[in-house]
A protein has these predicted regions:
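Class I S-adenosyl-L-methionine
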Residues: 1-187
Length: 187
């Protein structure tokens, strides 16, 4: 289990102040909220319209925004911590930020329960042309979950070169995401 940062206390205040829920814990652990967003961005929706692929993406609070230990191990070294995708477009809106924080705290407090819930949601929404991206705004090794769902196609981008090189799961397309700061790792 990850240690939560003091910032998570600020997030809990934001949750309380921005919802009609009386009890923060009920709000935080309410399972009526989806973990995955389906066809939720313009680029992904365009793929759905043109290729008829349904894409589910998991967005968490990345780097060390909620946890004392980062969910993006290469964020600082790669120089992508501050200009992170987490604040672009709709993800930068307050509701999206709160949803990412809620999911992240759920994952950090109960990783096994979170993975079970995620697996159930993936299977419940399965379609013919279907793919899942678990690291929409994080860089977590999900290979155990992905390996347990061999009939589902997954894809991700990672700044962890070793993970990209060692990936041997046939249902997981992992692209190494180079940046100016980590180009030397390719050489």
């Amino acid at each position: 289990m990850y240690e939560l940062k003091n910032k998570s206390l600020e997030i809990s205040k934001v949750f309380k102040d921005s919802t009609n829920y009386k009890d923060f814990k009920d709000y935080l652990y309410n399972n009526k909220y989806n973990l995955l967003g389906f066809n939720s961005s313009y680029k992904i929706f365009k793929g759905y319209k043109e290729l008829e692929y349904t894409t589910g993406i998991l967005y968490l609070q990345p780097s060390d925004h909620v946890a004392a230990k980062t969910l993006c191990p290469m964020a600082e070294l790669s120089g992508c911590k501050d200009p992170c995708l987490r604040v672009s477009g709709r993800l930068g809106m307050n509701n999206a930020q709160l949803a990412m924080a809620r999911r992240t705290v759920q994952y950090l407090q109960d990783p096994d329960g979170f993975k079970d819930r995620l697996r159930t949601e993936i299977l419940k929404n399965e379609k013919d042309k279907y793919c899942i991206r678990l690291n929409g705004t994080s860089d977590i090794d999900w290979s155990d979950l992905i390996g347990s769902l061999p009939n589902i196609q997954f894809y991700d981008y990672s700044k962890v070169l070793k993970r990209a090189i060692k990936n041997n799961l046939p249902n997981y397309h992992l692209t190494y995401s180079a940046s100016f700061n980590n180009l030397q790792s390719i050489e």
